[in-house]
Amino acid sequence: LAQGGAMLSETEAEALIFGHAAGNDLTRRDLQAEAKAARRPWDMAKGFDASAVVGAIRPGPLADGAIRCTVDGAIRQEARLSDMIWPVPAILAYLSRLVALCPGDLVFTGTPAGVGPLHRGETCTVDIDGLDPATVTLD
């Protein structure tokens, strides 16, 4: 985000957007399962070291295009950005009612159907038309 704000309308939220990037917010399912079993919050399943893989940020608006995720070159997920459930301004407006948004915030906005496990040694790439890919090889 280029600017921050709270309690925003969708129009106000859209004006905060600096640019777009491909990204992958990884989840450690082992930590998630442990936390759920213990009836504890599972934030750390999403917030562990190196859990947010992000490509280069391209300033400006993003045209509709494809988003895809490949694992070792095989397509696992693929959809049009226009098929995502919530438009980005709606997501930002909703978030701004829960927490203040700040300049520099990166917001991951969802994924197409097909989420699945990744294993050590696999290379996962998230690619969005018009953006640099976000790639990670799991150690």
Regions found by a protein language model. Name each.
Residues 1-102, 106, 114-139:
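Catalytic-core "active-site belt" of small-molecule-metabolizing enzymes
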